[in-house]
Regions:
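Flexible "cap/lid" subdomain of the alpha/beta-hydrolase fold that forms the substrate-access gate
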Residues: 2-36, 40-192
Length: 192
C-alpha cells in the first residue's frame, strides 16, 4: 500500500505495468527469474509471459485464469455473477464514494467477508488493507486497474496466448470472484 499511486487511468495500461515489472527485473540483476503473482499481479504476469517482455525461467500464478480463458468465461452468467464488481468499478467516482466511506471501512469488511475461513481473517489482519485504501488517491488507483483493463485495448492484445515457460497455477476452489471453470482449456495455452 505504500507505492506510488499514479492518478490517470492510462497509467494502469498493461504496457505500462509490464514496463514496471521489466524495470524491477532489470534492476535486480537476476539472471534467472521466476515470476510469482496473485490477483492483479497475476493478470500482469500472464500478459508479461505471453508477450515475452523479458525472459522468464518459470511462471507461478495464483487464482487468476489465463486471459483467453477469462475472456471466454466472462461471457457466461456464472462468471458474470461473480465479476459484477469489475463492471461497478467502471463507474466514475461512485465506487470511491461508497467504498471510501467511514475511512474505507467497507474495504476491511470485503477482505474479511470474502475469506473462505472467516474466523482466520480477523479485523486486525484486515486493518492494513483498510488503512492503505483510506490513503488519499488509493481507491482511485485501485479502481483504475479495472478501468484501464476494460477501456484500453492493450490488455486484450495477447496474440495466440501461448506461454512458453514452465507454469504452475495454484487455485483455491472456493474463490468468491473467479469460477473454477475459468481453468478449462488453459492447457491449450500453457503446454508446460
Amino acid at each position: 500500500g505504500g507505492s506510488s499511486r499514479p492518478p490517470r487511468k492510462r497509467d494502469y495500461r498493461i504496457a505500462n505495468l509490464n514496463a514496471d515489472v521489466a524495470a524491477l527485473i532489470d534492476a535486480s540483476g537476476a539472471r534467472e527469474v521466476t515470476l510469482l503473482a496473485h490477483d492483479w499481479g497475476a493478470l500482469i504476469a500472464w500478459n508479461f509471459a505471453i508477450n515475452r517482455v523479458r525472459p522468464l525461467a518459470r511462471l507461478v500464478i495464483m487464482n487468476v485464469p489465463h486471459p483467453h480463458c477469462a475472456r471466454r468465461e466472462l461471457k457466461t452468467w456464472r462468471q458474470l455473477r461473480k465479476s459484477w464488481y469489475m463492471f461497478f468499478f467502471q463507474l466514475p467516482r461512485l465506487p470511491e464514494l461508497l467504498l471510501g466511506r467511514n475511512n474505507a471501512a467497507p474495504i476491511g469488511r470485503i477482505f474479511r467477508d470474502s475469506a473462505v475461513n472467516k474466523h482466520r481473517f480477523t479485523r486486525a489482519e484486515a486493518e492494513p488493507y483498510r488503512a492503505a485504501a483510506a490513503q488519499p488517491g488509493a481507491l482511485t488507483a485501485m479502481f483504475n486497474y479495472y478501468r484501464a483493463l476494460f477501456q484500453t485495448p492493450d490488455a486484450r492484445q495477447t496474440g495466440d496466448g501461448m506461454v512458453h515457460v514452465p507454469t504452475l497455477v495454484i487455485w483455491g476452489e472456493q474463490d468468491v470472484a473467479i469460477d473454477i471453470h475459468c481453468l478449462d482449456g488453459m492447457e491449450n495455452f500453457v503446454p508446460d
